[in-house]
């Protein structure tokens, strides 16, 4: 086993789990009749207090109406990671609760967000077992162990993506693996020489995957052949996990753990532009950890990306010119809906910003400590996602919250037996949560 793989076990992990969610009406809260105007590890960047812009006072946020979302074929939804405003039922109730396999432990970490395609739900547990389930009732269809015999099971993996009847997996043993979605049969394997901690992105019969050494591979979806590669700056230290590439309009945007953000032509890997979201600040314990762990978004010709180093920026997809930037750091993926962005900061603030101007409209401080008086028990949050006029986040203390996207007001919350580290997903009017102990719960 490579030294990189061995070292990955030494990273600190959060031992948290999601249990059965109850009281869904309370959790979702009461829908407002009229909108009002308006981390995982101890060395995450700490920021100064963020406040709404004075020029934003009295601004009324207007969002597009929620629409049905049939599939969630890769981490972050679709290849561009722009999911906007999705619909879920008004009175969610638990439909089923299943185990997908092995969860997180001292040596293993559950990393893969579930994906949904063609009425099937696909998961990968911490031991690289990929399974397919019926999304309507949670019944297992097939299960496939893809770890080679010569490798250990306790490796930290990447994630999943679906396209053209195939499920693609990035793994901790340095292989991208393609499986037949109907049967789980392995179709091809491609050795990329280093572990992967982020999910692949599949678009146009190409599969894009980033290794922990900051090397981007573009593979042929049918054969696994290497079409081209691109190398970023290799980092000695980075955060656990990583951002998946975003693909749209013939461009792939690669987020590297160095804080680099690089745009390349999908066809041949030609570099169009490069930027850095390192955002080094004096006195920070993580000035060298500029990792872009949240997935970048491509939406209507603009790239939105946030780094742990304290930079949140909007960049022109074609030219690489910055449109706006904010000194906000985070490791969770931003969420875009209409003309607004919602993002969780490293300081546990949930923030609403303007898509075109970066103006801050509201800031809601989420609970930061289990024991606020003694500042003990740091709470981490995952999300947000936007569904039926509610921003949904989940935390390491076993609490999920819904907040108004119009003003940040808390609409509802529910106590759960354990916590959540993987952002929930929405497909077929269902809201799905995956716990650290590998329990998957569906609400519809």
PLM features per residue range, with description:
Residues 20-23:
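C-terminal motif of bacterial Sec signal peptides marking the signal peptidase cleavage site
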Residues 25-28:
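Bacterial signal peptide processing site
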Residues 34-52, 58-95, 271:
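Blade/loop signatures of beta-propeller domains
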Residues 96-115, 143-161, 187-203, 226-248, ...:
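Extracytoplasmic beta-rich repeat domains
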Residues 125-126, 155, 164, 171-172, ...:
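Structural signature of WD-repeat beta-propellers
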Residues 131, 177, 217, 262, ...:
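WD40 beta-propeller blade core
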Residues 134-138, 180-183, 220-224, 266-269, ...:
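Short loop/turn segments that connect beta-strands within beta-propeller blades
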């Amino acid at each position: 086993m490579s030294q990189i793989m061995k070292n990955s076990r030494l990273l600190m992990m959060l031992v948290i789990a999601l249990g059965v969610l109850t009281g869904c009406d309370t959790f979702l809260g009461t829908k407002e009749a009229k909108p009002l105007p308006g981390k995982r590890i101890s060395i995450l960047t700490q920021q100064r207090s963020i406040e709404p812009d004075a020029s934003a006072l009295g601004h009324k946020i207007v969002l597009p109406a929620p629409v049905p979302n049939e599939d969630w074929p890769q981490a972050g939804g679709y290849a561009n990671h722009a999911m906007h405003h999705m619909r879920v039922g008004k009175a969610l109730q638990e439909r089923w609760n299943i185990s997908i396999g092995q969860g997180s432990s001292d040596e293993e970490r559950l990393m893969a967000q579930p994906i949904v395609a063609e009425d099937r739900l696909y998961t990968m547990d911490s031991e690289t077992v990929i399974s397919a389930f019926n999304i309507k009732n949670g019944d297992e269809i097939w299960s496939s162990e893809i770890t080679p015999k010569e490798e250990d099971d306790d490796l930290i993996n990447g994630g999943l993506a679906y396209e053209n009847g195939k499920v693609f997996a990035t793994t901790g043993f340095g292989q991208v693996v393609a499986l037949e979605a109907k049967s789980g049969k392995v179709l091809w394997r491609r050795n990329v020489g280093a572990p992967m901690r982020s999910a692949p992105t599949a678009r146009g019969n190409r599969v894009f995957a980033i290794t922990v050494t900051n090397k981007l591979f573009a593979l042929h979806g049918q054969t696994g052949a290497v079409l081209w590669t691109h190398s970023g700056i290799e980092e000695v230290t980075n955060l656990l996990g990583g951002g998946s590439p975003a693909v749209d309009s013939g461009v792939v945007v690669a987020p590297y753990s160095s804080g680099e953000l690089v745009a390349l032509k999908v066809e041949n890997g030609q570099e169009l532009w490069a930027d850095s979201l390192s955002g080094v600040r004096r006195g920070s314990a993580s000035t060298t950890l500029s990792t872009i762990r949240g997935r970048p978004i491509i939406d209507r010709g603009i790239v939105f990306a946030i780094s742990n180093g304290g930079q949140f920026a909007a960049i022109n997809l074609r030219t690489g010119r910055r449109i706006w930037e904010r000194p906000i750091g985070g490791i969770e993926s931003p969420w875009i809906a209409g003309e607004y962005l919602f993002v969780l900061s490293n300081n546990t603030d949930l923030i609403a910003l303007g898509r075109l101007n970066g103006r801050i409209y509201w800031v809601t401080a989420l609970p930061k400590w289990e024991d606020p008086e003694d500042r003990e028990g740091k709470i981490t949050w995952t999300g947000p996602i936007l569904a039926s006029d509610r921003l949904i986040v989940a935390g390491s203390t076993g609490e999920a919250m819904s907040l108004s996207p119009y003003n940040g007001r808390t609409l509802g919350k529910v106590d759960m037996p354990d916590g959540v580290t993987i952002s929930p997903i929405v497909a077929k009017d269902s809201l799905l949560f995956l716990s650290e102990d590998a329990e998957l719960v569906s609400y519809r």
